[in-house]
Amino acid sequence: LLCNAGRRIEEGKYEDAVARLYRSVELVAQIKLLEKAGVDDLEGAGLRAGVVCNLLPKEMQGRYQVREVDGKFVFGLRQKYELLKDLGPKYGWPKADEVYRGIQADMEKRNRSVLAHGITPVTKEEAEQIQEKVRDIAGRALDNGANTVRDAMRTVAFPRVEWK
């Protein structure tokens, strides 16, 4: 997704790039939930209400005002990061709140874009800035930094072909 977002920026498709970057930020939270708590929210599965409540401290179990569909919680992006913070070091990611606060305004740019809920265009500079922040988030999630993420992205990048 990160490489794909980079290609979209190169093509001048900034809203498309930011939509992919938004999904990348959400995917980081989903992977952390699966990795740390065994809670599978990939493929839109939703979080099973009982599983989530059992992992949270009792004083936090009623904190989340979320939609419930077929016995599963449907969490938004912000709520996934809050949940990771609230689950604590054993089942969560204590840095999650700090990470989300650092990208929250940028994620709002996606929400205001034509590909989401608004009509405000995303500029090239905004897309590139968001891309850098998302690389950093991926690196922090892996606990090995954005440089490692950049290196990994180079290994999966499409080869450049020049046509004459």
Task: Walk through the language-model features, giving the residues of each.
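Amphipathic alpha-helical interface elements
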Residues: 2-82, 101, 151-159, 164
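Charge-enriched, short contiguous segments at helix-coil
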Residues: 89-156, 160-163
